[in-house]
Amino acid sequence: MSKKLHIKTWGCQMNEYDSSKMADLLDEYEGYTLTDNAEEADVLLLNTCSIREKAQEKVFHQLGRWKTLKDKKPGLIIGVGGCVASQEGKAIKERAQCVDLIFGPQTLHRLPEMIDQIKDGKKAVIDVSFPEVEKFDRLPEPRAEGPSAFVSIMEGCSKYCSFCVVPYTRGEEVSRPLDDVILEIAQLAEQGVREVNLLGQNVNAYRGATHDDEICTFAELLRYVAAIDGIDRLRFTTSHPIEFTQDIIDVYEDTPELVSFLHLPVQSGSDLILTQMKRGHMAIEYKSIIRRLRKARPDILISSDFIIGFPGESKQDFADTMKLIEDIQFDHSFSFIYSARPGTPAADLPDNVSLDEKKERLAILQDRITQQAMRYSRQMVGTVQRILVEGPSVKNPMELRGRTENSRVVNFEGLHEHIGKFVDVEIVDVYTNSLRGVFIRGEDEMDLRRDLRPSDITAKYKQADDLGVTLFTPA
């Protein structure tokens, strides 16, 4: 009988990616198969997030429920990974004796050895070190699960925003070598993946080593990935404004595979609050990036993160944020009430904004952005949109579900053979969380590929001066 593995994942898309790699790793290691039922599992893994308030308490509440399972099944192995594990380390074991494994985001590749040690009688294994990109060298080959895939290209962040725990829980920025990234994406493309989302805590800070000991910039990487046969749609998340350089913007001008949608967190529209957050830029600099982006790609839509009620946020500061939202006309946002994260500089600032005021401001902000998003959706009615068909519709399995470049779900009537492919649909109706489309044409009627090699694309923009320094010039 096969061994069963249950993974509960909280947090960002990077955690989702890590959890999928854990599952692949343990399947290859000893044939563990995933189960949604924790009660039938032989190994329980909790992949945690420390961004939100009371993250630690949430972990211990879950472990309390799992302890009941272990009392009934003494051989059950329980592991805690992710950012809370990295932050708390052995304190987790001291408070929850049922835990066998504690591992950080950078050491998940050591899970097989950790499990072996527990089976050999060791009481607990704790490894929350930061061995840079070693984990990627030890993970099994990628497995596609549908036409879209996430690929991690870097780990950590070196920006040290005053409110953020990422540099402390995932380490500083470390980029994967270019060849490793390209190989993983090419393997996914061979399995039918058509859309790739490049992941990183600060993805546009990517600086990956090449085979000849040069450095590949993020803009170059985008061009390389866009040239991989079979990859016809390209996304990335999450970016930082101070790393959003002109060469990245230039890619939007001539690379149709790169979608007309960008998530670029700003957090606040107040220069005073941005300074307190140690974001490294002002609101006008953010607006300048968006202005240049829209010049390169006029139809691009922008989403952002916002923190509401940061210590010292006055009514004027919030008004500045709302003014920025009006100026940019964001399509979507991930917005949260500020909660202090232990160990961060902002945790020492006086939190002088009342909870009621925070809630009111959050509601105002979310209502405004929802209105803007609905306006964009209505503007799509009557247009023809290219969507990647992901599978049957959630509400009506007799229909199909696809996603537009700007991440809107479209339900339409179509043939099963379209799943995993691109189709063009006319948008005919708008709902709160989806659009309605009518099938226009299939992939066999489209011209999706350009007859270019990766080197042809990058050579157009790359040149070296007399000193051998690589330069990029706009198209």
Curated annotation (Swiss-Prot):
Its EC number is 2.8.4.3. Catalyzes the methylthiolation of N6-(dimethylallyl)adenosine (i(6)A), leading to the formation of 2-methylthio-N6-(dimethylallyl)adenosine (ms(2)i(6)A) at position 37 in tRNAs that read codons beginning with uridine. HAMAP family: tRNA_metthiotr_MiaB. This is tRNA-2-methylthio-N(6)-dimethylallyladenosine synthase. It comes from the Bacteria. The gene is miaB. It comes from Shewanella pealeana (strain ATCC 700345 / ANG-SQ1). [4Fe-4S] cluster 2 binds at C157, C161, C164. It is found in: Cytoplasm. [4Fe-4S] cluster 1 binds at C12, C49, C83. Residues 3-120 form the MTTase N-terminal domain. Monomer. Residues 143-375 form the Radical SAM core domain. InterPro entries: Elp3/MiaA/NifB-like_rSAM (IPR006638), Methylthiotransferase (IPR005839), Methylthiotransferase_CS (IPR020612), Methylthiotransferase_N (IPR013848), Methylthiotransferase_N_sf (IPR038135), MiaB_methiolase (IPR006463), rSAM (IPR007197), rSAM_horseshoe (IPR023404). Keywords: 4Fe-4S, Cytoplasm, Iron, Iron-sulfur, Metal-binding, S-adenosyl-L-methionine, Transferase, tRNA processing.
